[in-house]
């Protein structure tokens, strides 16, 4: 098949209508693949060498949206590779390729996931935030919402009205797939 890797991944993203987090993760990986290989690569040409080069690219590339020249966090690199592996596994199951080239890469050559320490706001700090005026009310409300329900920034962005249901007592229930 003459399908490009990024074209195939975009198809998977479009099929992921019920999983907006996966859809946005795939789009993020596609953006990096397009920066790594501006002319693209055919899905059937993706091999161990290409993937090792992409891993090296992820280790060295700078975050686009960040003012500081920061490289991608190792957990972001790990997540991007996990997303790419998912797409390549789909390509195998749909007979676009016969084997997932990611399986040929040793674990020591892949980014390792770090356990991150999280600091949580105290009730006193949250109360202070609630009463602090901020010029962007929508952002303020979204941040406070994430504090009270424990959603990550990317989950808040992916959140849609159809993700909220109500039980028989009228309580709002949030349906998020991570």
Spans of model-derived segments:
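Intrinsic-disorder/low-complexity linker and hinge segments
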Residues: 1-3, 113-114
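Basic/aromatic-enriched alpha-helical hairpins
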Residues: 2-68
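Residues in well-ordered alpha-helical elements
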Residues: 6, 49, 124-127, 154, ...
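DNA-binding alpha-helical recognition surfaces that contact promoter or target DNA
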Residues: 25, 53, 79, 86, ...
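Alpha-helical scaffold segments in carbohydrate-active enzymes
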Residues: 29-36, 57, 76-79, 83-93, ...
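Hydrophobic/aromatic-lined pockets within catalytic cores
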Residues: 38, 59, 63, 89-96, ...
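Basic, Lys/Arg- and aromatic-enriched nucleic-acid-binding interface segment
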Residues: 71-74, 78-82, 93, 97, ...
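Conserved tyrosine-mediated DNA breakage-rejoining catalytic core shared by Y-recombinases
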Residues: 104-107, 149, 158-178
